Amino acid sequence: MQVVEIFKELCKFKSITPDDDGALNYIAVELSEFEAFFIEKEGVKNLLLTKKFSDDGEHLAFGGHVDVVPAGEGWSNDPFEPLDKDGFIYARGAQDMKSGVAAFMCAVKEVENFKGRISLILTSDEEGEAKFGTLEVLKFMKEKDILPDFAVVAEPTCDKKFGDSIKVGRRGSINAKLLIKGKQGHVAYPQKCINPVHNFASALKFLAGFDLDPGDEAFAPSKIVITDIRGGMEVCNVTPNDLKLMFNVRNSPQTSLEDVKAYVEKTCEGLDYELSINQSSKPFLTQSDSKIVQKLNESVQKITQVVPELNTKGGTSDARYFAEFGVKVVEFGVCNDRIHAIDERVSIEELEKLYLVFKDLLENFN
């Protein structure tokens, strides 16, 4: 099947983020019937491929990235020379996410009749900072007045078996640094010190693992997760001058940045502290009755005979940028059991079925 050959070619590009290593040029040539726009920002290369099939109808986009994380040591094969073995293809980016890119490339190549417009949005800046990739392409599309109505981001979403998960949203991400101030001194004279560890100890239980909301059927609770805590100089006779704490909240729409800040301020009332807090991504949800959710759900069940769970689990992805521009977006791809791992691999059967899912979606979308 052509999707396997295109996938193998994509895996040969040593496209370690943010370098596409020529992968985007290869894709543009393969899909030469689409109008191509190369969009570069801060050394990041992006590609928009778009084709209008009719003046009426809707605009459906596929999104993905060609960049991969570094391979590291310990592989059984050269991670950029795909190995076909026992029904799997081993390569860096096999699951995350050159399989998804190859699948929608082949699906759109075969479209003859579509009511509306089809676009492909590709970047080499997703695994890194992700600041100058998909976001820049969407800005460009807005300027050209060709923002899509719907989008499918082909990230590896499936858990136990192919077809079991469609992402219909994502939690946001809030990062914070908390500094509890004290006064350094000798442990033998605690009355002359201000020990920030002692002062903060009673407040810690109200932060560590605390749920800021109860969650709902779409989102898990917005939980405070402490990622680092330290104070002192690793000696036993000096009290620390301050206590540093870092935490993250993967927040649902029920809890905002302002809510997190207010809760921390209330918890730290009476302490001498500094709080630095920012939101790196916002939560979003595409409703289950949206056309893109329903159509993709139908195609997944038809091809895989599996009923997918519609969920918002996992970390952030470029899908959040589509949502910021008002695009109804979902995510669907192969299983994710070996993403970013040594000997990353994808099942050939999953790859071929993913192509068939996208092909069926396009054929039955209008």
UniProtKB/Swiss-Prot annotation:
It catalyses: N-succinyl-(2S,6S)-2,6-diaminopimelate + H2O = (2S,6S)-2,6-diaminopimelate + succinate. Pathway: Amino-acid biosynthesis; L-lysine biosynthesis via DAP pathway; LL-2,6-diaminopimelate from (S)-tetrahydrodipicolinate (succinylase route): step 3/3. Binds 2 Zn(2+) or Co(2+) ions per subunit. GO terms for molecular function: acetylornithine deacetylase activity; metal ion binding; succinyl-diaminopimelate desuccinylase activity. The keyword Amino-acid biosynthesis applies. Zn(2+) 1 binds at H65, D96, E155. Catalyzes the hydrolysis of N-succinyl-L,L-diaminopimelic acid (SDAP), forming succinate and LL-2,6-diaminopimelate (DAP), an intermediate involved in the bacterial biosynthesis of lysine and meso-diaminopimelic acid, an essential component of bacterial cell walls. Homodimer. This is Succinyl-diaminopimelate desuccinylase. It comes from Campylobacter lari (strain RM2100 / D67 / ATCC BAA-1060).
